[in-house]
Amino acid sequence: CLSLLAKTVPNMIVSSADLCNSDKTDGFIKGGATVISRDNFAGGFLQAGVAELTMACVCIGITLHGGMLAACGTFFVFSDYMKPAIRMAALMELPVKFIWSHDAFRVGEDGPTHEPVEQEAQIRLMEKMKNHSGRNSMLVLRPADCNATTVCWAMAMENMTSPSALILSRQNIEPLPEGTPYEYCRKGAYISAESDENPDIIFVGNG
């Protein structure tokens, strides 16, 4: 998705907290964006270093300036470092796109320090809080596979009244069964496997 956005959204800047190869924000570079440096400010990708809060604040500043779209990525567990900026983006109703990968315990060799547990609950609490305009403070999206991710990216890019969060996995995931109504992502949920009229158990999945 980021590779396509690099080709089609010239006023977009993407940043990563020293993790672009891991959180796949380097897709923006692969799509043609050049890296911003002290000698070249014409690029579209900002290497923020290990500075998650600063990165989020820079994206807020870019968005406040106007005329630009900003997105930033890191591991989901590090969203904790960004909370003050996320909260301010929500209060100011800024359409910053937060890309958080490695959303579960499958984080490779990094171990429990990099395994998000309580982070989604915190972000979800912000989602349904009404802002000063009476709208949700945040759009939180956790797609189930690559097809749902495409729809969720479209939703995030269309959302210009609040921050958007894309909570993504580390590992490759098999697509859901053929015929899954991915367009229902826009409604908040969809049925991927039907049952009879009176099921004994209903499994509800998130991500």
Features from the language model and the residues they span:
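Thiamine diphosphate
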Residues: 1-175, 181-185
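Long hydrophobic segments that form regular secondary structure
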Residues: 161-162, 166, 183-207
